[in-house]
Amino acid sequence: MPIVSESELVAAITRDRAAKKRIALAAACFDVLGMDDVRALQTARAQADRLVVAVLDDGAVRARLGEGRPVVKLEDRAEIVDAVRGVDYVIVCARADVDRLASLLAPDVRA
């Protein structure tokens, strides 16, 4: 599935909830995606029917990891995460928006 907007994500999750699907939400920088990241996403997906992944924007990555980061540009990080088996939806957001997104989606699992 391509990277989605917030409105597209909310609509999709609303349909998934109507179909009684369990939702997991994971959020991270994913700058230089490693096997630990992939395993964490797989673990989250194993606990739910749908996995939403929030890829943090460049400002959030820089604030968390320091100057010179991110190494991988945002669009590539989002596309790489989208390619991980089991990821259903990818959204890009600022760190401050993750809690608001969680309120909107009310995930059953937060990873």
Predicted regions and their residues:
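Nucleotidyltransferase catalytic core that binds NTPs
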Residues: 1-111
